[in-house]
Amino acid sequence: MEDFVRQCFNPMIVELAEKAMKEYGEDLKIETNKFAAICTHLEVCFMYSDFHFINEQGESIIVELDDPNALLKHRFEIIEGRDRTMAWTVVNSICNTTGAEKPKFLPDLYDYKENRFIEIGVTRREVHIYYLEKANKIKSEKTHIHIFSFTGEEMATKADYTLDEESRARIKTRLFTIRQEMASRGLWDSFRQSERGEETIEERFEITGTMRRLADQSLPPNFSCLENFRAYVDGFEPNGYIEGKLSQMSKEVNARIEPFLKTTPRPIRLPDGPPCSQRSKFLLMDALKLSIEDPSHEGEGIPLYDAIKCMRTFFGWKEPYVVKPHEKGINPNYLLSWKQVLAELQDIENEGKIPRTKNMKKTSQLKWALGENMAPEKVDFDDCKDISDLKQYDSDEPKLRSLSSWIQNEFNKACELTDSIWIELDEIGEDVAPIEHIASMRRNYFTAEVSHCRATEYIMKGVYINTALLNASCAAMDDFQLIPMISKCRTKEGRRKTNLYGFIIKGRSHLRNDTDVVNFVSMEFSLTDPRLEPHKWEKYCVLEIGDMLLRSAIGQVSRPMFLYVRTNGTSKIKMKWGMEMRRCLLQSLQQIESMIEAESSVKEKDMTKEFFENKSETWPIGESPKGVEEGSIGKVCRTLLAKSVFNSLYASPQLEGFSAESRKLLLVVQALRDNLEPGTFDLGGLYEAIEECLINDPWVLLNASWFNSFLTHALR
């Protein structure tokens, strides 16, 4: 523990803690847990005070380090960490100048803004128990108490937390990091169990007379005398407290807190049934691109011009035919729809002048595919409320589906590197503050790791398709507009490249509400034979439309080219979020940043450079049946990004529910791993809530399978 403390804390804090222990005649070689506790408390007091100043107008402001304004008056006077004589001198001086009441015990800080002393507490136990002990010891309404715990909880007098949320979050993050570092070295258990309650003068002396009456009068409500209150605090059981509170709520509520042990949790039950099918709005790993390098044609950048130019690069077109029919659809209509697209593109070329947009003829096959005139007629409720058997039409329960291997393959593919660059480094002006320099350095390192990633391609593809579809839905509400599915990238050599994945035909789109649906037919190129995994393509009709010559080790080989066609739909709100998919980059960057922050706070310097440039170090990526998978920092970046992208591509109520409910179980398991002796009630109900979200969604089923792998290895 002593070695850990010297590594983990600033040398100045360690020195102050050594002095304090010497002053109280304690041996830090023996009382190592106390040594760690004093250092932690000192650091929290310093962090509490950091960056907080009072300006000339007497207002509290936050100023980062290295700021020329740091000559402003400090908002907090730090009393903790001074020797006793000096500390009391400071307290007396404050009382004389501010008129504050002199405290009986040495407080930790004085707040010049609120004009009050502050007692800071850091506890390994329940915050409210420690708060009561502190309040009982101080017995002064003038001293403000603020308690932090290692689990992120806090409690303060009258729920007045003094600091802004961000400053308190820094303290909580640091405490959580210390706890994790201790746990990883096997020190946390002993440290947690070594905490003793606040020693008070009352425990050493018999209290009589006036003092006794005052003690009895200053108890919390519902306690008649000091003995009762002492007995309550000594015998306080948080789990029993929760049970009692629940039983007060209702006679029907009867919760018994059961201990949560390694043998308690069972795996999550995944549903049986036929394998799940692909439900993303566009093809992922199976997509094929027709591309042009260094585009410089007339009208370059206009989607229809780009699409026709890309189509001209392929010469292997042939008479299309259905190779994998859609079980419930009219497959000849899908075939006719593709032929219509080819014919209308040919008409454009024959005319010589390419229009900016193309509206398809409203043929019977497109009307069928886009559900034209299929929606039931809407009738005003007032006109039919007197009908006796009026009811909402029955909808079938979704059929249960089982997990299939294709979704894991999709995820693995999303984490891989491609041979193209999908995002540019943002051009940002020079940094003016150290924190900006660190932030842009992190962003640049992260961008370098993910710019070639396939998940980044999916982001740019999703942004383009959703933007184009939303624009067309608003600009051409009654038209069946042809929308090319395009993306732009750069080759490794830096040459620009335009890619065509296929086409979308949009249906009627009078979208008044956010959730109103626009139907569309997607037609996407692929080299994947659908007959290899027919269950994956349940919702598609697949045509063979040509033969493509590919370079291979044995020379050129010819491969059949397929077109994956399906009817689909989306809404304004879904398209709006699809246009925002770049946020996935930000989310995964923030996750990486929190890893860097944890590392930096232990080493007490910014570890960004070492983090990304130490290629020999491996990091945990996730769980698999084999155990904890590890990889380079680049692999971690790409895996986190792919998870974020798949959460966007496969967003659904099932995913929302599973994420929220499984997180509760995850927290309990984490608490067990940290030896926090968690207790639960109605664990069966929690499993039920998790499992009712496992219906047919491939991404949710995969996450549930990963969760089971985590359970297996976490509880060994």
UniProtKB/Swiss-Prot annotation:
Instruction: Check the record and name the InterPro entries matching this protein.
Output: INFV_PA, PA/PA-X, PA/PA-X_sf
What keyword terms does UniProt attach to this protein? Cap snatching, Endonuclease, Eukaryotic host gene expression shutoff by virus, Eukaryotic host transcription shutoff by virus, Host cytoplasm, Host gene expression shutoff by virus, Host nucleus, Host-virus interaction, Hydrolase, Inhibition of host RNA polymerase II by virus, Manganese, Metal-binding, Nuclease, Phosphoprotein
Task: Give the coiled coil ranges.
Answer: none
Intracellular or extracellular location(s) = Host cytoplasm; Host nucleus
Binding of Mn(2+) 2 occurs at E80, D108
Q: Where is this motif: Nuclear localization signal 2 (NLS2)?
A: 184-247
Give the cofactors, semicolon-separated.
Mn(2+)
User: What is the E.C. number?
Assistant: 3.1.-.-
Positions contributing to Mn(2+) 1 binding: H41, D108, E119, I120
* Annotated GO MF terms: endonuclease activity; metal ion binding; RNA binding
- What does the note accompanying the cofactor annotation read? Binds 2 manganese ions per subunit.
User: What is the first-listed, main subcellular location in coarse terms?
Assistant: host cell
Instruction: Map motif Nuclear localization signal 1 (NLS1) onto the chain.
Output: 124-139
List GO terms (cellular component aspect). host cell cytoplasm; host cell nucleus
Family per UniProt? Belongs to the influenza viruses PA family.
Q: Which HAMAP family match?
A: INFV_PA
* Its biological purpose: Plays an essential role in viral RNA transcription and replication by forming the heterotrimeric polymerase complex together with PB1 and PB2 subunits. The complex transcribes viral mRNAs by using a unique mechanism called cap-snatching. It consists in the hijacking and cleavage of host capped pre-mRNAs. These short capped RNAs are then used as primers for viral mRNAs. The PB2 subunit is responsible for the binding of the 5' cap of cellular pre-mRNAs which are subsequently cleaved after 10-13 nucleotides by the PA subunit that carries the endonuclease activity.
Could you give the subunit structure recorded for this chain? Influenza RNA polymerase is composed of three subunits: PB1, PB2 and PA. Interacts (via C-terminus) with PB1 (via N-terminus).
Name of the protein in question: Polymerase acidic protein
Specify the species: Influenza A virus (strain A/Brazil/11/1978 H1N1)
